[in-house]
């Protein structure tokens, strides 16, 4: 018997249903939802700390939401298939997070668009007759933003065959992780915008506040992950052994890079005197964004690597066409942001007390 043939057969790595595009989609929608929540802190709760950048946060939410679904279309490989998502499967609506997502994305998109219009009229045109409409639109958008994060978490968590993903705390974990990346991205974009597109000086107090928010969310993220991993690795009697093997293989990436570098370090910066120094604040923002992206990558790519019909963990190789699609995705993101700046004539900071 030729054992080389047997070895070749059992070593075939099946292609994952989800790849890098899905991880990027989850990452971008998280930033969009989080920035809408930050804008709502002013438009609903009248938090003065977020007044100057509330409109900027809305723009970030809108642009990231415009670009995010393109990852889903690219992942289908045949864009015409997107029509089937709208036409079929509605009889399974209550048990299909994908169907929830179709409605949530549509309603959230139009809600952000409407809030951009209303807030521009109220804040910059001083048309106070829209104030009440802006308030109610913000409440609706706030609820939809939470729904966006919860639905994407359900997409992952209902995969019962993947033990690393199937946990009831995933919706909360997704929301907190989104707030980490959202606050980090808001720090970076606000700093870049004020530095290069306005004549104003960078207000360290604003960025100190944002770094404290980032640190709080990073702390919550760490606590939830500790609970998650402790149950997975110690108290999950059925699957803890294969989970322990997985952590022996990926532990450095998950514990030291994702949780240590990208969560613990921003936490230290935010809760120490380093939050008064802009370079460290921007470093914390970069790490927060990177950590959330790595978290999504770990869930989607590493989470699907657990063996079911194969004798070992699956290996993932990024397809070149997918990589080009991701690069084009971020190129479009930058182009849309520049277009919005041109449309509003670079006047997107809310003045006054």
Predicted regions and their residues:
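N-terminal signal-anchor module of multipass membrane proteins
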Residues: 1-45, 67, 301-302, 337-338
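Membrane-helix interface motif
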Residues: 2-3, 73-84, 151-161, 226-238, ...
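Membrane-helix and juxtamembrane interface regions of eukaryotic multi-pass membrane proteins
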Residues: 10-18, 46-53, 87-147, 152-169, ...
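Membrane-interface transmembrane-helix boundary segments in multi-pass integral membrane proteins
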Residues: 21-26, 98-102, 170-174, 237-266, ...
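Long, contiguous internal "core" modules enriched in hydrophobic/ aromatic residues
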Residues: 28, 111-276, 284, 291
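Membrane helical hairpin/interfacial module
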Residues: 28-111
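Internal alpha-helical transmembrane segments of multi-pass membrane proteins
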Residues: 40, 52, 276-283
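TerminUS-proximal long segments
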Residues: 279-285, 289-353
């Amino acid at each position: 018997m030729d054992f080389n043939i047997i070895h070749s057969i059992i070593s075939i790595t099946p292609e994952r249903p989800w790849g890098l595009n899905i991880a990027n989609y989850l990452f971008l929608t998280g930033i969009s939802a989080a920035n809408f929540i930050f804008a709502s802190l002013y438009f609903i709760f009248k938090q003065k700390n977020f007044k100057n950048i509330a409109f900027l946060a809305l723009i970030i939410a809108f642009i990231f939401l415009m670009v995010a679904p393109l990852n889903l279309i690219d992942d289908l490989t045949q864009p015409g298939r997107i029509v089937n998502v709208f036409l079929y499967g509605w009889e399974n609506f209550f048990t299909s997070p994908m169907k929830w997502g179709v409605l949530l994305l549509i309603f959230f998109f139009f809600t952000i668009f409407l809030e951009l219009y209303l807030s521009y009229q109220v804040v910059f045109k001083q048309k106070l007759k829209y104030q009440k409409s802006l308030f109610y639109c913000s409440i609706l958008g706030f609820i939809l933003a939470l729904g966006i994060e919860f639905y994407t978490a359900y997409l992952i968590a209902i995969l019962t065959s993947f033990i690393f993903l199937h946990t009831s705390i995933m919706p909360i974990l997704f929301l907190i992780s989104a707030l980490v990346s959202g606050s980090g991205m808001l720090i970076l974009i606000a700093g870049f915008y004020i530095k290069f597109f306005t004549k104003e000086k960078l207000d360290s107090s604003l960025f100190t506040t944002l770094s404290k928010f980032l640190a709080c969310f990073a702390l919550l993220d760490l606590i939830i992950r500790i609970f998650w991993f402790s149950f997975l690795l110690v108290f999950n009697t059925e699957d803890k052994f294969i989970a322990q093997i997985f952590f022996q293989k990926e532990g450095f990436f998950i514990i030291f890079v994702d949780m240590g570098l990208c969560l613990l370090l921003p936490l230290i910066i935010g809760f120490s005197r380093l939050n008064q120094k802009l370079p460290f604040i921007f470093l914390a923002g970069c790490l927060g964004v990177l950590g959330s992206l790595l978290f999504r990558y770990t869930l989607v790519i590493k989470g699907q690597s657990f063996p079911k019909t194969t004798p070992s963990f699956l290996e993932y190789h990024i397809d070149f066409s997918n990589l080009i699609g991701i690069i084009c995705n971020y190129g479009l993101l930058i182009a849309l942001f520049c277009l919005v700046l041109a449309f509003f004539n670079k006047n997107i900071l809310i003045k006054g007390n």
